[in-house]
């Protein structure tokens, strides 16, 4: 089975580290990039065809995670989106963008495993 390329986009390095550690246990997902801003993520997405993007809803950038999802939804071969959020306030908008899931911090490891399965 070919591995799915993952990009981690979160403002907090500890959340990126937790995601990276959780994904080490998943044989078919390989983390190929990390970013802390939408701009960095877009640069990486221009060069690597990521299959999945784990992203913060609350980016300290020109756009938030939902707006970035809207931009990406217009791209050919857009990655699947898994939102990581501090609250449920943007969940409806995330699912309107056909997000795979909307996970709350602190991350529930069981829920995370169900999302990836």
Where are these regions (language model features)?
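Amphipathic repeat-derived elements
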Residues: 7-17, 64-73
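A structure-centric signal for secondary-structure junctions around beta-strands
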Residues: 1-3, 78
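CheY-like receiver
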Residues: 25, 42-117
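Short loop/edge segments at beta-strand edges and connector loops
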Residues: 33-36, 104-105
